[in-house]
Amino acid sequence: MDKARKLEIIKQYGRSEGDTGSPEVQIALLTERINSLTGHLKVHKKDHHSRRGLLMMVGHRRGLLNYLADQDIERYRTIIKQLGLRR
């Protein structure tokens, strides 16, 4: 993910200009990295080091989603729908 794509995601999901800490932005950035790494692992099936990193990112995203669901269920439902995550 290049810098321009990262700024685009922050602008799209951020609550204000330059908002990088909100759960929505963190979840969206993690989702982008997860999708990228998933494509990498389809080509490089034996890359177990990257697979472990992928599983850690998925776990981190799950924790952020759980936090958001506890804090504000509407924001949670919105981000799930926007990113196309199933739950």
Curated annotation (Swiss-Prot):
Instruction: Cite the CDD domains for this sequence.
Output: Ribosomal_S15p_S13e (cd00353)
Entry's NCBIfam families? Answer: S15_bact
Report whether Repressor shows up as a keyword of the record: no
What InterPro entries does UniProt report for this protein, alphabetically? Ribosomal_uS15 (IPR000589), Ribosomal_uS15_bac-type (IPR005290), uS15_NS1_RNA-bd_sf (IPR009068)
Name by which UniProt lists this protein: Small ribosomal subunit protein uS15
Query: What does this protein do, in the record's words?
Result: One of the primary rRNA binding proteins, it binds directly to 16S rRNA where it helps nucleate assembly of the platform of the 30S subunit by binding and bridging several RNA helices of the 16S rRNA.
The family note in this entry says: Belongs to the universal ribosomal protein uS15 family.
Which one of the record's GO molecular function terms can you name?
A: rRNA binding
Q: Which GO terms describe its biological process?
A: translation
Q: How does it assemble?
A: Part of the 30S ribosomal subunit. Forms a bridge to the 50S subunit in the 70S ribosome, contacting the 23S rRNA.
What keywords were assigned to this record? Answer: Ribonucleoprotein, Ribosomal protein, RNA-binding, rRNA-binding
Give the gene name: rpsO
Looking at the keywords, is Electron transport present? no
* Any GO CC annotation of this UniProt entry: cytosolic small ribosomal subunit
What organism is recorded for this protein? Clostridium botulinum (strain Eklund 17B / Type B)
Q: Which domain of life is it from?
A: Bacteria
